[in-house]
Amino acid sequence: MSIPRMKSYFSLIAAVLMLGQVATAQAENLPDFTGLVEQASPAVVNISTRQKLPDRAIANQQMPDLEGLPPMLREFLERSMPPGSRPPGAGKGDRQRETQSLGSGFIISPDGYILTNNHVIDGADEILVRLSDRSELKAKLIGTDSRTDVAVLKIDGKDLPTAKLGNSNTLKVGEWVLAIGSPFGFDHSVTKGIVSAKGRSLPNDTYVPFIQTDVAINPGNSGGPLFNMAGEVVGINSQIFTRSGGFMGLSFAIPIDVAMDVANQLKASGKVSRGWLGVVIQEVNKDLAESFGLDKPAGALVAQVLEDGPAAKGGLQVGDVILSANGQPIIMSADLPHLIGNLKDGSKAELEVIRDGKRQKLTVTVGALPDEGQEMGDVAGTGAERSSNRLGVSVIELTAEQKKSLDLKGGVAIKEVTGGPASLIGLQPGDVITHLNNQAITSSKQFTEVAKSLPKDRSVSMRVLRQGRATFITFKLSE
């Protein structure tokens, strides 16, 4: 072999060896989950429920967890279910008289207290818990909280394996996390991923700052624990965002600090109490920030103040932007309900607000969150008609009865949308305009005057009441 060819040969060998060393180094840097799984698995349980339903309800019931699965997998899962819980048409065609759902949970005390999701056991007539040794026990429901989707169960036992609880506040974005649960009934399945974001706000989940991860979560994982690399529970896997019905890389967990606060209250009294301001708030976007004179989008915009509520008594007004509560900044509007919800009835909330472009501080005595929301009436007015072609709406006065029903001192109702900005921003007949360009509307005449003087060089805000729900919207007039 010639010297040049020998040099090429040895160079190739050296390159292969270097690649092997790099691959080995990368493998050594990846986390080893085996010890964590061995330590944590015994405390994770499978939860199954049975619910008796009328024949008609059962005949119409779908089983979405099995829909769309490959035939062999669907058949396997149907065979593994008790005969009474199989979907319509399964087996010999017997009419189904009870339904079954599957979920996960974890033991938090040696005497048998278990955490899971409310939606896992909601409406159940019987709750069964299967432990890691495959033994099954009936569980007693201690309490539930639908607002956070947390439930506490109790099984009879002693010296049971328990999950080690961590601190979700110290969790960092990018940190490795691991889930153990029963997706589709496959007990103690392990999946891993990283924390994608913290403090996520989801629709209809006002009181939970969710942990977002890319851990694979599927039906049956709900209620199971999310672990950090120290083997500590940092969250309860609760829901996913999906367009297909299956996992798409967006999973959400309830922080364990939130869950344990709820659990401790449920164990003590069977119910959960939360602080309450009595306001309806919305996000401050770029255009709203501009219209209210803010440097950047931040805070919670007060769209509605409930009569005789804590906020009304404390002097909070529609159009105020709440920037902080007890020194804690309100970055997103969803931060406010969580901060106030953690306060006790009768405690003080020091609020920093922007009003008419100026900062000021208010002290509000926090109330107790009521069980049900307060409803406001619809609008169907018959008053004096005015129009404003600049906005593209025809408006009418509210009657005295309508003002009383809606708890309003003024405002005008939209009779017709004729085009212009009103059409672009989605205004509808029956909407009530209570504020325009940061001014309270007291009559249709004043509304027309304010509309004529609207600026064209910046965003303009408008407060609209629709079916009892108030919101601020923004628009710009064309040149």
Swiss-Prot record:
Catalytic activity as recorded in UniProt: Acts on substrates that are at least partially unfolded. The cleavage site P1 residue is normally between a pair of hydrophobic residues, such as Val-|-Val
Matches recorded under PROSITE patterns: PDZ
Top-level taxon: Bacteria
Residues the entry annotates as binding substrate: G220, N221, S222, L277, G278, V279, V280, I281
Residue ranges annotated for the PDZ domain, each copy included: 266-357, 363-468
GO CC aspect terms: periplasmic space
Catalytic machinery residues: H119, D149, S222
Function: Might be efficient in the degradation of transiently denatured and unfolded proteins which accumulate in the periplasm following stress conditions.
Name used for this protein in its record: Probable periplasmic serine endoprotease DegP-like
Gene: mucD
